[in-house]
Amino acid sequence: MRYRGWCLCFLLAVSSALAPAAEKPLATRILIVKSTRTMTLFNGRKVLKTYKVALGTAPVGPKRIEGDHRTPEGIYTIDAKNPQSRFHLSLHISYPSVAEREQARRLGARPGGAIMIHGLAPDFAYLGPLHRKVDWTDGCIAVTNAEMEEIWKLVPVGTRVEIRP
């Protein structure tokens, strides 16, 4: 009887050690807060992870027109993933909305586009987290390449993105 108890304990220990690790749940929402330079991934109400980010070189205020170097503000969606991005990997954000296009048209300009969450270009990958010391993008949200690899796995196309001032 004692022998069976030890065998059972041994089998339970071995089976739990061999069981695949539980995968992290996927993000259902991304919250980017420009004033704190943070991006938080959520699954429901549960925080999966928060990252420090770099923004466009003119970070205050919402994006209005192409070339203003601002990061947009509003509710968007991840509508594409680009594994061949020149900034390591990238997730395309659905900016501009219909209203943002119309606003740019009224200003006699184009709204711009190609707003992404992305990593670092190969020539600057060595900077790692130092890249966050200054806002340097054309309006995108930048993280390190290691962070982007993690984000890439956690964020499916269709994920909601909220960008706040």
Per-range role (PLM):
Residues S35, P72, P111:
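Exposed loop/turn and edge beta-strand positions of beta-sandwich/beta-sheet ligand-binding modules
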Residues M1-C7:
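Bacterial N-terminal signal peptides that target proteins for export
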Residues P25-L26, G67, A80-P165:
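Exported/periplasmic cell-wall-interacting domains
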Residues P20-E66, R164-P165:
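Intrinsically disordered, low-complexity
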Residues R29, T50-K52, I75, A114, ...:
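Well-ordered beta-strand positions in beta-sheet-rich domains
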Residues C7-S15:
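Bacterial N-terminal signal peptides
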Residues G61-I78:
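Short, surface-exposed secondary-structure junctions/capping segments
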